[in-house]
């Protein structure tokens, strides 16, 4: 990666595509577009399952490609980021999913041909990676309502109606939500423990966007080396509607029913124990230790992107010493 300033500077690039993602069928057009733009693609790997994705990523990394372009939704890209974290391999992103929030954070165009052009001519930056009991996430980890939303989001619903699927799934999940209690502990001592009751949701953000374009907080960033933690207290429907109206710009964190803090590490304990949603995938359970791996992933972004900087040739080791 030493001299890679753009994707076309790579010695060898592998493309890994989640064929089941919402726009996965368009991957051949994307590969052709990247090749014409000068990306030195030497292998293309459509995958059809999580196990297939894991094995394919292991193989392409072992083959020594210095650029791995991953096409899929946020769950696919987040998993791939966990595999390349702490290495000198550069990650390229093709937004082929429904929400594509990581791409939105990095200012990667949603239009596929524009995304291919931006990737070929893009610059390399470093971004942070969140960890939940060691499992990676790029955007947001959460418990509560968001898990029920994920469970209500069928692949068919996402494929046929796109981002609108999140609104439909949210209404369905809200109708059957049960509140819970949580304790937030801060191992670095930057906050006193927080005991919270009657909660709708707790979320821990590493990136800036989630849920199809919502904003974690007005100041959240993918390279600020900080986690944004918020908890929403259950209440009347009208209160939740007022919060929902503030999600797009992140100003909801100032609402009376929202608790918000920032930290580099937090432990979440809930009663009852709850599953944890990591970038759209249920991949952990409480109690959960959330940490941040600074500058963990080298990734290609458009030349005009201001989302992150390149801080150095190496990422922070994982696990931290």
Task: Show which residues each predicted segment covers.
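Glycine-rich phosphate/pyrophosphate-binding beta-alpha loops
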Residues: 142, 146, 203-218, 282
């Amino acid at each position: 990666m030493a001299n890679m300033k753009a994707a076309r500077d790579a010695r060898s690039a592998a493309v890994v595509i989640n064929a089941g993602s919402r726009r996965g069928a368009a991957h051949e057009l994307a590969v052709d577009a990247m090749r014409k733009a000068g990306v030195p693609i030497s292998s293309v790997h459509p995958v059809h399952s999580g196990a297939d994705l894991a094995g394919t990523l292991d193989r392409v990394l072992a083959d020594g490609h210095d650029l791995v372009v991953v096409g899929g939704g946020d769950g696919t890209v987040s998993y791939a980021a966990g595999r390349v974290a702490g290495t000198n391999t550069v990650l390229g992103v093709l937004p082929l999913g429904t929400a594509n929030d990581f791409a939105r954070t990095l200012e990667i165009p949603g239009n596929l041909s524009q995304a291919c052009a931006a990737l070929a001519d893009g610059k390399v930056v470093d971004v942070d990676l969140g960890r939940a009991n060691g499992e990676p996430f790029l955007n947001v980890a959460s418990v509560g309502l968001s898990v029920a939303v994920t469970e209500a989001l069928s692949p068919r619903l996402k494929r046929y109606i796109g981002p609108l699927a999140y609104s439909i799934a949210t209404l369905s999940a809200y109708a059957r939500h049960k509140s819970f209690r949580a304790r937030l502990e801060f191992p670095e001592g930057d906050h006193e423990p927080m005991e919270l009751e009657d909660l709708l949701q707790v979320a821990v953000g590493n990136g800036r966007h989630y849920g199809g374009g919502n904003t974690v907080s007005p100041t959240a960033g993918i390279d600020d080396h900080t986690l944004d933690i918020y908890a929403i207290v259950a209440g009347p429907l009208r209160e939740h509607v007022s919060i929902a109206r503030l999600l797009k710009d992140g100003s909801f964190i100032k609402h009376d029913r929202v608790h918000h803090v920032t930290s580099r590490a937090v432990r979440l304990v809930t009663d009852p124990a709850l599953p944890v949603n990591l970038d759209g995938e249920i991949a952990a359970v409480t109690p959960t230790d959330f940490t941040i791996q600074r500058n963990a992933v080298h990734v290609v972004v458009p030349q005009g992107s201001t989302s992150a900087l390149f801080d150095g040739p190496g990422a922070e080791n994982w696990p931290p010493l």
